[in-house]
Amino acid sequence: VKIFIDTAKLEEIKEANSWGIVDGVTTNPSLIKKAVDSLEKKISMEEYIGGICKEVDGPVSLEVKSQGAKEMIEEAKKIYNMFNHVNNNVVIKIPVNTAMQDDQENYEGIKAIKKLEEKGIPTNATLIMSPNQAMLAAKAGATYVSPFLGRIDDYIRVKMGLKPGKDFDKGSYFDEKLLEKIRIEKKREIIKEEIKEDIGRIYVDERLKELSADIKSGVDVVRKIKKIFENYKFKTEIIAASIRNARQVMEVAEIGADIATIPFDVIEEMVKHYKTQEGMRNFTKDIIPEYEVLFKK
């Protein structure tokens, strides 16, 4: 699996890159602004983004700000021309669907992806929440698709009636089996309630429809996308995004996701293990004086 680092902090990018583990970077405008604002020595955003592109030889995903296809294409060309010459590694993040409500156009992202790829500008279809969205982005020619694991998990948990901050924290891990047990229990409660009123309502209850949805978790979305892409030989690569803990990284790697884009704190979590620390303590105790002498010669 390739590892991208999901950050705008140049010091984190440089540190992780020095370990030889970074294959690319994903970021967004708000993260970049925070990183620039936190610097003691003030530099322009343009100079800062150029520094990110220079630091990493792999792809660097940069985002557009508009919602219309025409505007996104113009912004993408501008960003690409501004930064790609630095290290020939710029990828443009395009939301797969830019609509913010039901009465807005749903296809602007797909349109922009197609046009940009035809112009030779690589795209990363972002905010992917379903296998269908990933399939359409791949058909349009996207270089990458980014399913958002953490956000999908949050959505599923809330639909099950769990409350953020009370029943789960942002970084907490729920495996599919645990989620399935919760789902079954919730369905039982609703069916019991509906039977008392009218058994026929079971078939139209929106809560039951939501709980019977085919998607089990964010990792499950990656699994389904992977299967579709393999079936139809799509060249589009899968970037598992919105990763919040080390377990998710392990699971998407097991599935065969092409890339996991990981925040720095999760990378730190990946390298830690209590038994490794314990082993190091024992190891240092076991070093005998005769062995230490070898290092003094």
What kind of region is each of these model predictions?
Residues 1-3:
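Extreme N-terminal starter segment of soluble prokaryotic enzymes
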Residues 5, 9-13, 19-21, 27-109, ...:
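Active-site beta->alpha loop and helix N-cap motifs at the rims of alpha/beta catalytic domains
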Residues 21-22, 57, 142, 257:
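A structural motif
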Residues 100, 104-114, 122-263, 276-287:
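Catalytic alpha/beta core domains of metabolic enzymes, predominantly
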Residues 263-269:
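A hydrophobic, small-residue-rich beta->alpha segment in the mid-to-C-terminal subdomain
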